[in-house]
């Protein structure tokens, strides 16, 4: 009897690649962010495709987000903007990693900023896979 003749056999027609799978996990983690404008998620995996850590952007742990501004009007003083309080997804994941990230890959929903790029490099991340880069057409890029 051939395998296909078995009534319990089914053929997988379509399966996610590892890159698709981990990017979907990063996208799901971004939904934990309370930021009304920008939701970013990240997932770090080792060379065996085991998840090491994940993160999303949000205020510093332990701070009541109702007390801080989510505004992003750069004409306002920094204390009235989210930028002085929000920890980026990559930084949150690195801070909560249970082990070394050396040699890992980072899947992130938004191209890392300069500060996060430095953290990624310093943590030994060997590859960054991003979903979008909303600043790619700006003059500073």
Model regions and ranges:
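Zinc-dependent deaminase catalytic domain
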Residues: 1-141
């Amino acid at each position: 009897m051939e395998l296909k003749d078995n009534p319990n056999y089914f053929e997988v027609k379509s399966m996610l690649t590892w890159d698709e799978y981990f990017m979907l996990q990063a996208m799901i983690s971004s939904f934990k962010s309370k930021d009304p404008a920008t939701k970013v998620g990240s997932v770090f995996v080792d060379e065996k495709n085991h998840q090491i850590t994940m993160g999303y952007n949000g205020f510093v742990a332990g701070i009541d987000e109702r007390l801080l501004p989510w505004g992003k009007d750069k004409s306002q003083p920094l204390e009235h903007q989210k930028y002085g309080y929000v920890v980026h997804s990559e930084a949150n994941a690195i801070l909560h990693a249970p082990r070394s990230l050396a040699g890992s890959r980072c899947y992130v929903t938004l191209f890392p900023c300069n500060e996060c790029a430095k953290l990624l490099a310093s943590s030994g991340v060997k590859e960054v896979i991003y979903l979008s880069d909303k600043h790619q057409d700006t003059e500073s890029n």
